[in-house]
């Protein structure tokens, strides 16, 4: 089974420009580490021109901490296709950088242990939130001369119960199979502006990024505190438009079970810094969780 790229050439380059872009993002990359303290990372999934540098901070930290055997990558289901909780079952994912293998054994175990997920490829066919993470992983594993596998999971339902069930299933599957795992939660933060039908406050253009950051940081503080209930409570109270809370909640639950004791915000920005448009502004954050 092969999953072909759906957004190469739009969200990220489909040609040699991709390597040049990744080289620029990782120009300050250190040596591959071996500590393996990082249990999970949060990374955005917009077009690389907007959020690629922010995403690279998550992967830089993971590389310098030590690459795992398997990346379990969770992202929201933007298309509505397929199963509500869909684990890609087996095969390979292709990008302009080549192919990466799905950890079929881990995928099947997560689906079975969760009690809520299905093995389903349709949900992934056109979804970008996971695909845009893959070239970062491929680039770094090529540098390290290693092979890693992925388990892609899309979330059409995102709440505390899903987060707990999936986080627990990923941990139990990793323990049962003896896998060294890092969970990636693919999410953007606030989607502000008339284009998104969400204008909870008004601000001058030069003040807008700061105001959006204030709102996003209410959620980021909950993430840094490993507070799943608080995260979803803030989301509901604010009617916040973060698109991957279930992915982040799952990463928190898994990380706690895996012994994580600290979380760090590595980078934050908004699309306004590039677009200078107030019609549609999105927040992006890079976060890692460590044992």
Swiss-Prot record:
Any Pfam family the entry gives: Memo
Classification via CDD domains: MEMO_like
InterPro entries: MEMO1_fam
HAMAP family assigned to the protein according to its UniProt record, in alphabetical order: MEMO1
Family named by the database record: Belongs to the MEMO1 family.
Protein name in the entry: MEMO1 family protein TGAM_1726
The organism of origin for this protein: Thermococcus gammatolerans (strain DSM 15229 / JCM 11827 / EJ3)
Classification lineage: Archaea, Methanobacteriati, Methanobacteriota, Thermococci, Thermococcales
């Amino acid at each position: 089974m092969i999953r072909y790229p759906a957004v190469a050439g739009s969200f990220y380059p489909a040609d040699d420009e991709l390597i040049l872009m990744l080289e620029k993002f990782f120009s300050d990359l250190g040596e591959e580490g071996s500590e393996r303290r990082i249990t999970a990372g949060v990374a955005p999934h917009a077009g690389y021109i907007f959020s690629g540098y922010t995403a690279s901070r998550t992967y830089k930290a993971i590389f310098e901490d030590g690459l795992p055997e398997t990346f379990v990558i969770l992202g929201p289901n933007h298309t509505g296709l397929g199963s509500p909780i869909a684990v890609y079952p087996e095969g390979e994912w292709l990008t302009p950088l080549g192919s990466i293998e799905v950890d079929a054994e881990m995928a099947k175990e997560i689906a079975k242990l969760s009690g809520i997920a299905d093995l389903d490829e349709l949900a992934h066919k056109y979804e970008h939130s996971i695909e845009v993470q893959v070239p970062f992983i491929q680039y770094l594993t090529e540098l390290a001369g290693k092979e890693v596998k992925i388990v892609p999971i899309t979330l059409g339902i995102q709440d505390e119960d899903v987060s707990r069930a999936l986080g627990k299933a990923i941990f139990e599957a990793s323990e049962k199979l003896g896998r060294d795992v890092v969970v990636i939660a693919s999410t953007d933060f606030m989607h502000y502006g008339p284009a998104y039908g969400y204008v909870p406050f008004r601000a001058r253009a030069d003040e807008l990024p700061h105001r959006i950051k204030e709102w996003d940081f209410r959620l980021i503080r909950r993430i840094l505190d490993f507070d799943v209930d608080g995260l979803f409570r803030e989301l509901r109270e604010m009617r916040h438009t973060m698109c991957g809370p279930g992915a982040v909640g799952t990463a928190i639950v898994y990380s706690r079970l895996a012994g994580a004791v600290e979380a760090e915000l590595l980078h934050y920005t908004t699309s306004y810094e590039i677009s200078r448009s107030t019609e549609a502004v999105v927040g992006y954050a890079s976060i890692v969780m460590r044992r």
